[in-house]
Amino acid sequence: MMKGIDVSRYNGEVDWKAAKAAGLGFALLRCGYGSDLESQDDPQFARNVRECDANGIPWGAYLYSYALNPTDAKSELQHLLRLLKGKRPLFPIYLDMEDADGYKAKRGMPSREVLTEIVKTVCAGLEDAGYLAGYYANRDWVETKLDPEKLSGYSFWYARPGVEKPDRACDVWQSDFPSTGGKWPGANIPGSGCDTDESFVDYPARVRQEGKNGWPKPAAATQPARAADSGEIIETTCVLDTTMDVEKPLGTCYTLKLTCPQKPAVTAGSKGVCVCPLSADGKNTWLCNLVGYETGEVGIYTQVPGEEVCLRFRYRVT
């Protein structure tokens, strides 16, 4: 769990160095509100991004939505993309779904279907642009104004302040408002406090691993192996925990661990060793049991889709 805050122009010029010294793990920064107009940019956003980057604070962003229909939502999407250009957040980008000032209610609150479609329009557009996307909502909005099942693929930032723990599954929990005791050194609204949050997902690791939000995707790990056809040593993305020949008694099970971005195939070069079906052991990791049923020596091979078949080691059954 990481502890964080969310801030906007109302927090003034945040002392990010002091906030970091107090143990701040992340920040969610308001970048603006409504349609794509410069007059609706948050005047503190650019500074907050610079200061978070300078102090090593992972950050994400949010836009307060005034959209009444998917057409409005497309403008809000462009607003986000304009302000995010050239920046590399390590947390998702959220659409803030609420009606704090009554704007939507005064104009006829859109239906649940329309509000859900507004979120989908923005989040899908963010994902198409390479960002992790999500939405912010409180309990009332989740229960009466949005359809969470249709938004399950997006990060959920849940506003449920002043309770011991959230009453529904969420990725980020807004745990306190100033009115419920939320405070953070360097970030408190003058004469008040600060919104505080907790993240149950290690988003910095996920963003880097998946190459989202402008971060380069790390190259897949490789391991040298002998190509079966040419006999040349090549690099394969199927990394084994076994690189030397194996010798086991007849009937003994040997477990091979494979790490690969795609599910590889494992085969024996001849009879004598049973290669059991692969079983998943986490993301991009598989286990394969090898059992010798006839004495002798057998080559064990792997193949990754798009790569050559490789001889990995010899399995001797005694």
Predicted segments with their positions:
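Hydrophobic anchor at the start of a short beta-strand
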Residues: W59, L132-G134, F156
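Aromatic-lined carbohydrate-recognition surfaces of secreted/lumenal glycan-active proteins
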Residues: A129-T144
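Glycine-rich, charge-decorated loop segments at or immediately adjacent to ligand/cofactor-binding or catalytic sites
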Residues: D72-S75, W141-K150
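Extracytoplasmic soluble-region selector
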Residues: Q223-T318
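Functionally critical loop-and-helix segments that line ligand-binding/catalytic clefts
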Residues: M1-N11, K17, A21, E149-S230
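A mature extracytoplasmic/lumenal domain signature
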Residues: R9-N11, Y33, L63-S65, D99-D101, ...
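Substrate-binding cleft of extracellular glycoside hydrolase catalytic domains
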Residues: M1-T121, E127-A129
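Structural recognition of alpha->loop->beta junctions
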Residues: L81-L95, D99-D101, L146-A169
